[in-house]
Structures are given as C-alpha cells and as structure tokens.
C-alpha cells in the first residue's frame, strides 16, 4: 500500500469516527428531549439504535486493524489509530448509557412521574460536550483537549452511578 493510499484510508477512518460521533450527539439530544416527553416509541428507538453503535464500533475497529496490517504505521499514525480505537470504545459505552437511560424511561412511563436526580441533566450535557470535544480533539490532533475528555470520563461515570442508584431506589418504592 502506498503512503497516499494509507493517508486516504486514515482519512476514511477519521470520517467514520466523526460520523459515529455525530450520530451519538443526535442520540444524546433524543435522550434529553425524551426525558421531558416520555415517549415510549422514542425510547424504544434509542434502545434499538444501540445496535448501530455496536456495529459502528466493530467496523471502525476493523478499519483500524486493516490499516495496521497492510502497512507499518509510523508513530504518529499509531497514535491516531489508537486514539480512534479508544474513542469509539468510549462512544459505544456512552451509547450503551443512552440505551440504559431509555430503558429506565420506559419503566418510569409506567409509573407515576418521578423527579430526576439533581445532577442528571448535568450528566447528559457533560456527555454531549465530551462527545463533541472527542471529535474535535481527534480531528484537530489536540492533545490538551483529548486529555480533558479523558478526565471528564470519570465525571460521567460518577454521574451515571448516582443516577442509576437514585432511579433503582425510586422504582423499588
């Protein structure tokens, strides 16, 4: 494979990551809107769409492996490929969170309205910004922004654990 061909395939890889990110931003917007609308059909759609993120992750991982196996990447190429692998794994996990939130939403639709945990909307906004920053970091090779995203991941995990505990407690009552 020539270097030009490699660079073209690397561009395609980065584009696949961007598309997954844009789709995830859209899903996060749907989750946020559905918390107010409490639309069972929309919740089901979000849950079903999680399979698309699973497939995107697998396809992007295949693209990464193909790049590595067909040409020996230089150090900067390895960093970009490794960043893509890490990012798509994180985005897929966020998509899983969106699906989980939608499953909780379906359960809440069946019960009396329940107030959301205090930090819930903050969590979703942080997740959305994290996706946007991740795409920007990889597109612009911005290491500082990438480090910010990594630090933010723990914050999202903590928010999600709080939310899950709160909703589980409420549903058991």
Language model features with spans:
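Cytosolic, long alpha-helical scaffolding segments
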Residues: 1-173
């Amino acid at each position: 494979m020539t270097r030009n061909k490699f660079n073209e395939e690397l561009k395609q890889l980065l584009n696949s990551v961007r598309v997954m990110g844009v789709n995830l931003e859209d899903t996060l917007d749907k989750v946020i809107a559905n918390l107010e609308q409490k639309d069972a059909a929309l919740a089901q759609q979000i849950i079903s769409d999680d399979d698309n993120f699973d497939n995107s992750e697998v396809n992007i991982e295949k693209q990464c492996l193909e790049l590595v196996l067909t040409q020996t990447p230089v150090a900067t190429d390895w960093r970009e490929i490794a960043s893509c692998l890490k990012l798509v794994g994180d985005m897929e996990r966020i998509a899983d969170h969106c699906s989980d939130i939608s499953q909780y939403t379906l359960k809440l639709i069946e019960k009396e309205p329940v107030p959301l945990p205090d930090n819930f909307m903050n969590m979703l906004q942080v997740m959305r910004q994290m996706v946007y920053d991740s795409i920007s970091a990889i597109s612009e090779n911005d290491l500082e922004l990438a480090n910010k995203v990594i630090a933010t991941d723990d914050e999202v995990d903590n928010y999600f654990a709080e939310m899950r505990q709160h909703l589980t407690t409420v549903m058991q009552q």
